[in-house]
Structure formats: structure tokens, C-alpha cells
């Protein structure tokens, strides 16, 4: 003997829901990498840029011996001055650019952009109810680039905008949670199924033995599920239908089949009331005579059995998904076929 399942009412397959879906919060922001000031390259000088030639002032004898060269150096000061300007500008151009970038350009850019970054970081932290922790200087600015007082001003401005963003995000997170819980509660109510069952097993001296059961499932608000099917995507909200079961088992030397979970229990939906990640998206597979098959990453819900097909041109209907599937039957022009299937929550 096997388990016989009957139901009062039916629910749409998970993949046939459409409409409002739960809102997932923005993931908490990661702390920004602090880009420190670059190492300034070593300054390169030219001996022609010195006022006097090197090594001529060590003694009076060196000075007198090199007097013509010294006079030439003094006479060529104007020309060497122009040479040194060009030399330092060309060979030390990287220092010149870095000085402009990190002392003028970047502070100005960060002054206008950093407050918005602080606001965005505070928004995500507040929305996820994370710890209130304003980050340090964001962008290319650190205390190695600017004087301490300037860095303090930038940090104070960032703290203000972080606080504003945190407050807005916290209030927004409460509304998102309320919205998700309302959708979750509505979908749980309209798709809830209650199963009553009786299972019997017997084994008399190994001669007379058998096991079987009867289950009857009620969907009290299945009519509401049909009304809301195109307005709330309960397949995405729940991931699987919630069910409760009350099954009585009578054992006379045997054991009840696995299709009859003896006792009282409740199987909640696969998805949480407040989603902590991307909601599962159903994958619709077109199958002839069967409609669609729903596959959820977190779904443990079984699928209903498919209807049989006759030997003629007619084909059977498809079983319904949910807690239990009802078998369809089909008839051909010269024959008939029937089949039944049931889906159980894992």
C-alpha cells in the first residue's frame, strides 16, 4: 500500500506568480582603501647650477689654481640661471606635477565629492542597521597629504554627512522591513496548507503485512491565492509553500511509509520574512502538456505529478505544484490514460 493524497482547493505553481516582489537592501559598504600620498622622487641637481665650481674652495691654492674657471662661472651666471630653470623643470617635472595634484587638484575634488561618498556610506550602514562607525578620510586624502587642521576639517564634514545618511538609511530600512513582512504575511496566509492524515502498518508473523496511509490537505484561502496571483509574486516571496500536518499513525508490528510523517509538524517557507540577499528567481521551462517547472535555489517544495496521455490524440492535464499535487487524467480517441503525483515538502 502507498499513501493516497487528496486535497480541497489548489495553489498555482510557484513559477506562475507575478507582481510585487520583496525589496532587498543594499549590502553594507566595504571600507574604502586609503590611498596615501606617493613617495616623492629624489631631487636631481646639476653641478652647473652651483654658484661656484665644486672643490675649488678647499684651500687657497685650489682657489688660485682654478681662478679662470671661477671667473668663467661668475660671468656665465645669467646663462646658467636659464639653463638651471629648464633643467629642473624637465628632469624634476614629476615632482612638479605631484605637487599640483596632491596639494591643489585632489583636495578641491575631494572637498566636493567626499561629502556625497560619506552620505552613501552612512545610508547603506543605516539601512542595514550596522554599527555607527564613520570611516576615516575617504578618497586620496590622508594626514600625510594635508596639514592636520585641514584633515580635521575634512573629517568633520564627512562625519556630518555620514550621520545624515545613516539616519535616512535607518528610517528607509524600517520601511523596507515593514514592506517585506507585509508581503510575507499575506503570501503565507493565502498559500497555507493544513494536512490531516492516518497511516496504518501491520506485520503479523511475517505473513500478513502491509503499510499505507491517507492524507487530506486543505487550503483554506486558496481562493485568495487565485485573486492575488497576478499582483503579488508569492513564489519569489516564499520560495516554497508553508504547510502544517497532523498525521496519526497506527503500528501493528510494522512501520509507516516515509510518505506519512507521523505526528504534528510545520514546514515554513524556504525564504525568510526579511530577505538577506537576492530573492530566488524561478526558472520557467516550457514542457509540452505540463506548463512550467519552477526551480528555486532554496526551495524544498515538491512538484505535482503530470497527467497521463491516452493512446489517441488527447493528452492528460498537468498536476498542480505546492504541498501536494493532484494527478490529471487524459483520454484519447481509442484509449485513456491516467496518472497521479504528489509533492511533499522536504
Swiss-Prot record:
Keywords of this entry: Host membrane, Membrane, Transmembrane, Transmembrane helix
UniProt superkingdom: Viruses
Transmembrane segments: 67-87, 104-124, 134-154, 156-176, 181-201, 219-241
Compartments, record wording: Host membrane
Gene Ontology cellular component annotations, sorted alphabetically: host cell membrane; membrane
Chain positions covered by the region annotation Disordered: 294-346
The keyword Transit peptide belongs to this UniProt entry's keyword annotation: no
UniProt keyword Oxidoreductase present: no
Major location (coarse): host cell
Compositionally biased region (Gly residues): 302-346
Topology versus the membrane: Multi-pass membrane protein
Record protein name field: Putative transmembrane protein ORF346
